[in-house]
């Protein structure tokens, strides 16, 4: 199977595009996912990934680039969730659940209204083997931009992630960095939609980062390990999906889940935690 996969990479341009795109998404999703994990915003990541669906559908209806619609609706969902949480007795998880389910339902309706040739299944679950050259370069461009922003603003992002109260007292505008992270999350969600679809995007964001969290002792090392695991899961998932002729996006997610499952039992932090629990 490995030989066939390598031969396919040498012969088929679409497979080369798929591999490069998958690696790029794995790297950038792994990096952004670390901040999502540290901020306890896994549900927010799920909401944003679902919220881009109506934006994509509306973009098809209006004949504009789907990046524009997806980013607008991703930010709209973020603002709506924050507003509901800040101006009512409703807790954040409830606000997130209401918002993401509503946006997902709206997206399905808009796709039906658009009557486009775009397959709903591919939007929901991805089709990385259909990635074109322009999609690949756009993914790389977005990935480089997101990573550059993280590097340039690493310190305030780190501070607002670990201790927002301290950051506020130091004059850091916490809300601005919160919404900046939402922008980065939306960008990653839009690019990852091509590989795993809107349904499974959150797994690309959360699972490699959660696995890295079991090993890392600093945010930098966590980001590096998470991105590496994301890229490795993407490569192996593409190999398995292509070789067995099954859904590549799902293979990527399941490969990442296997990494986490193994780490859950062997990671040093986990062993220490189990030892501490057993001693009580």
Swiss-Prot record:
Specify whether Amino-acid biosynthesis is a keyword of the entry: no
Q: What is the annotated localization of this protein?
A: Cell membrane
- What Gene3D superfamilies does its record include? ABC transporter involved in vitamin B12 uptake, BtuC
Supply the alphabetized keyword list.
Cell membrane, Membrane, Transmembrane, Transmembrane helix, Transport
Q: What is its main location?
A: membrane
Q: InterPro entries under this entry?
A: ABC_BtuC-like, ABC_TroCD
Give me the segments passing through the membrane: 18-38, 61-81, 94-114, 139-159, 174-194, 196-216, 222-242, 246-266
User: Which biological process annotations from GO are given for this protein?
Assistant: response to zinc ion; transmembrane transport
Topology relative to the lipid bilayer, per the entry, is: Multi-pass membrane protein
Q: Which Pfam families match?
A: ABC-3 (PF00950)
| Gene Ontology, cellular component aspect | ATP-binding cassette (ABC) transporter complex
Which superkingdom heads the taxonomic lineage of this protein's source? Bacteria
Quick check: keyword Cell inner membrane in the entry? no
Q: Which family does it belong to?
A: Belongs to the ABC-3 integral membrane protein family.
Function recorded in the entry: Part of an ABC transporter complex involved in manganese import.
Indicate what this protein is called per its UniProt record: Manganese import system permease protein ScaB
